[in-house]
């Protein structure tokens, strides 16, 4: 699909229930020129390796990705990031599972506990859903009150981004 759309893939690795070995093998399967996993990829219909530029090390680790504390996730991130590399020689940008909305402490802990040479980015999760009670609402069938609620929350995203950026800049002003 990414080749058809001419865009870069983003692979999100499972650190909640998957192993370091499993994620490292997925990256090898995708990017290796030769070896057992490249042979398996060819057997599955794809002889040439894919290009992989972005690797998300976990996703929503503060919630459904493991309900982790940022300190614990930071330790896992360092472990997983150590063993994941591209087999085609290109740079693999490793992206940490970032905070949800206004959880600035999550960003501070990650920036403080993960070596900057191991982390190339942090994802941000920000949602403009109706509620977290399991009923996120319809994408097309909503009333005026719901619409205004979503738009007002969307307007706040710039402030959230700027606040997380300020924290990251304090630890790494050159990026």
Label each region the model flagged.
Residues 1-14:
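Active-site-adjacent substrate/metal-binding segments within catalytic domains
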Residues 1, 33-47, 78, 102-114:
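Alpha-helical scaffolding within the catalytic cores
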Residues 13-34, 116-121:
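Carboxylate/His-rich catalytic cores and anion/metal-binding grooves
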Residues 70-175:
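Noncatalytic carbohydrate-binding groove/subsite architecture in carbohydrate-active enzymes
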Residues 12-16, 57-60, 97-100, 124-127:
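Active-site-proximal beta-strand/loop segments in catalytic clefts of secreted hydrolases
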Residues 3-4, 46-51, 55, 89, ...:
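Extracellular/periplasmic catalytic domains that process cell-envelope and extracellular macromolecules
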Residues 36-69, 125-136, 175:
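Active-site groove signature of glycoside hydrolases
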């Amino acid at each position: 699909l990414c080749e058809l759309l001419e865009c870069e893939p983003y692979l999100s690795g499972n650190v909640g229930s998957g192993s370091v070995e499993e994620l490292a093998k997925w990256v090898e399967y995708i990017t290796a020129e030769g070896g057992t996993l490249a042979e398996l990829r060819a057997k599955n219909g794809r002889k040439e390796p894919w290009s992989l530029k972005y690797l998300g090390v976990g996703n929503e680790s503060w919630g459904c990705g493991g309900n982790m504390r940022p300190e614990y996730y930071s330790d896992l991130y360092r472990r997983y990031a150590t063993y994941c590399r591209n087999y085609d020689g290109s740079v693999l940008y490793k992206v940490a599972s970032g905070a949800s909305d206004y959880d600035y402490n999550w960003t501070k802990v990650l920036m403080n506990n993960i070596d900057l040479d191991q982390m190339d980015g942090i994802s941000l999760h920000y949602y403009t859903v109706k509620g977290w009670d399991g009923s996120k609402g319809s994408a097309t069938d909503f009333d005026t009150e719901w619409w205004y609620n979503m738009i007002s929350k969307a307007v706040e995203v710039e402030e959230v981004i700027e606040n997380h950026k300020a924290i990251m800049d304090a630890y790494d002003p050159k990026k």
